[in-house]
């Protein structure tokens, strides 16, 4: 029987998605606040750097695992300020998270040109060769079958389309690595319990980060999905990395 990890726990592969859904449904209303607290606001700078990887906003963009919509709404605002003709599709398997994204888009008056689709990253309901860019930020490690999700990304991108992924990675500097591990396993779950009442959700978060492949290992996975011109850029000493590749 196929098994996979849910954090450090071994579970049946077909159980992971429902468990991940439960995690994010339980913390959806405090998700943005927790991101600020856990990263000391750094996630905003990481995401700003991430969207700089999309120079042409006159594009059809798919944002997968959109969550509360941070990436898509940053792109929508940038496009609105520039007068660009952007088309943005926000996709997430968790309906409650997409509900948060919709609410934010209305509050910020950025809902124009946005589409919202509840869908799995492993089975996207879009035709082949549909999008100029595929973005996914802090989401791919939560997908039960990452290789399948990467192949779906390749399928829905147009020829010359760009895949861009922002994800937690492996810290390179030993002193920072020691602090980061201590902070992740001893502090973040406690903050999560105080703010959301759900320590287990943040135990899963830090465990899933620890298990995610290294920069070079993930690069190989991207290549095996069919992508070329694969690169990554470490941010904050490798706490996170931006991975990019093209469908040629």
UniProtKB/Swiss-Prot annotation:
Keywords: Menaquinone biosynthesis, Methyltransferase, S-adenosyl-L-methionine, Transferase, Ubiquinone biosynthesis. Pathway: Quinol/quinone metabolism; menaquinone biosynthesis; menaquinol from 1,4-dihydroxy-2-naphthoate: step 2/2; Cofactor biosynthesis; ubiquinone biosynthesis. Signal peptide: none annotated. Its EC number is 2.1.1.163, 2.1.1.201. It catalyses: a 2-demethylmenaquinol + S-adenosyl-L-methionine = a menaquinol + S-adenosyl-L-homocysteine + H(+); a 2-methoxy-6-(all-trans-polyprenyl)benzene-1,4-diol + S-adenosyl-L-methionine = a 5-methoxy-2-methyl-3-(all-trans-polyprenyl)benzene-1,4-diol + S-adenosyl-L-homocysteine + H(+). Gene3D superfamilies: Vaccinia Virus protein VP39 (3.40.50.150). S-adenosyl-L-methionine binds at residues 68, 92. One of its GO terms (biological process) is methylation. InterPro entries: SAM-dependent_MTases_sf, UbiE/COQ5_MeTrFase, UbiE/COQ5_MeTrFase_CS. It is an enzyme of class 2 (transferase). GO terms for molecular function: 2-methoxy-6-polyprenyl-1,4-benzoquinol methyltransferase activity; demethylmenaquinone methyltransferase activity. CDD domains: AdoMet_MTases. HAMAP family: MenG_UbiE_methyltr (MF_01813). Methyltransferase required for the conversion of demethylmenaquinol (DMKH2) to menaquinol (MKH2) and the conversion of 2-polyprenyl-6-methoxy-1,4-benzoquinol (DDMQH2) to 2-polyprenyl-3-methyl-6-methoxy-1,4-benzoquinol (DMQH2). Belongs to the class I-like SAM-binding methyltransferase superfamily. MenG/UbiE family. This is Ubiquinone/menaquinone biosynthesis C-methyltransferase UbiE. The lineage of its organism: Bacteria, Pseudomonadati, Pseudomonadota, Alphaproteobacteria, Rickettsiales.
